Amino acid sequence: MKFVIESLTKNSGRLGRLHIKDGAPGQRTPLLMQTTKGGSIPYLSADVFESHVTETPQLLELTLSTIDHMSEALAQFNSADRGLSDYIGFPGHLNVLLLRDPCETTPAGGNDRDIQPLFTRRGKESLSPKRYMEMVASLRPDIYQGLCDADTNAESAKKRVQKSVDRTEKFMHYIYEHKSKVDSTLLAPIVGGYNTFARTQSIKHALEQPSGSYGGYVFEGFHTNGLSATILDASKLLPIVEHCVGQLEEEKPRMVPGAYTPLTTLELIGLGMDLFDTSYAYCAAVNFKALTFTFVQDEVVHVPFLDITDDAIKEDFSPLLKNCVCLSCQKHTRAYVHHLYKTNELLGPILLMVHNLHHYMAFFEAIRESIARDGLPQLTELVRRQNGDSQVDYSIAPNRKVISKATMGKGFAAAAV
């Protein structure tokens, strides 16, 4: 894997191009990885994704917690001309393997001296460094993260944070020794919660490795995934990230998985982060929210979401977002998507995912354009206030509205309870 920085500014982060393997097209950074569950884009088939969201090859974010059951079959499927992306139905796309699903809250606890817990659909699995490398060898991803203990957040005690660093170092010692058996690029995990000393210790362990031991960094341990990433305090997060970035070399990409809000994402990019994922778009969709925040300068005050459970839109025949060119907005209306919610139709989350992914990918294109002209601070301020007088709240609250079976199929006639 090769990472080339094309533009670096003090106020606007950096533009780069990531070349993951020979023969594959380069990926422009800041890059938005496509989050998957069980090897699939949530709610979307490969055909729908490639025909109605984007035809451009993407970097797929796969998680071991949702595809661990595939390792045995993939050991027989993989060959010189077939890989993990081919197996899941996305030939031509690149992939990165992470441990935890950024879309769902990772349970706390279950940590042991010599194993890392992996929470799957079948329950908790015990993952030793040896077993992890065997699974990576079977799955053969293009990129994979090192095994780490990321069971920390802003409330974690100092003892728990230190244990996460010590256990990660122990795991990574084995990974570094045996990585030559895997023909994939390794990402070195940087853990340590919100403790600058612990983060520095984690960074030093990575920097002590021989040149070429890994191709980039993945920052873990800031949150427990799922909606927790949308509500974290950026005033605590950003100083820690800035502290870490100052100790890292420029020529390696930096990944921060999780459902960070658009505003926090922009602030992280300003500090030098490169790779993000679409888990925020997914979390919004499964909680019945269409993304409507603007990243194009105008004079109109905008809101971050459209709540499609709101009865106020049941007769609103405008698109989810004005001037959006996605399939959902071109072919359907707010009233129709609200009707799909009330009748519990599967097409509802499909249309929301199509719109949210399209909108978030356009957002990242706008980010790259703004960095190219050194305009990231202006874009950040627009996203922060949306032309209003105060900062917009991008956190996502879980939708707790329930539609009873008695009201299903009655469309606009019955209200959710």
Curated annotation (Swiss-Prot):
Gene3D superfamilies: Queuine tRNA-ribosyltransferase-like (3.20.20.105). GO terms for cellular component: cytoplasm. InterPro entries: QTRTD1, Queuine_tRNA-ribosyltrfase, TGT-like_sf, tRNA_ribo_trans-like. Non-catalytic subunit of the queuine tRNA-ribosyltransferase (TGT) that catalyzes the base-exchange of a guanine (G) residue with queuine (Q) at position 34 (anticodon wobble position) in tRNAs with GU(N) anticodons (tRNA-Asp, -Asn, -His and -Tyr), resulting in the hypermodified nucleoside queuosine (7-(((4,5-cis-dihydroxy-2-cyclopenten-1-yl)amino)methyl)-7-deazaguanosine). NCBIfam families: tgt_general. Its cofactor is Zn(2+). Keywords: Cytoplasm, Metal-binding, tRNA processing, Zinc. GO terms for biological process: tRNA-guanine transglycosylation. Its main location: cytoplasm. It comes from the Eukaryota. Binds 1 zinc ion per subunit. It is found in: Cytoplasm. This is Queuine tRNA-ribosyltransferase accessory subunit 2. SUPFAM superfamilies: tRNA-guanine transglycosylase (SSF51713). GO terms for molecular function: metal ion binding; tRNA-guanosine(34) queuine transglycosylase activity. It comes from Drosophila persimilis. Zn(2+) binds at residues 324, 326, 329, 355.
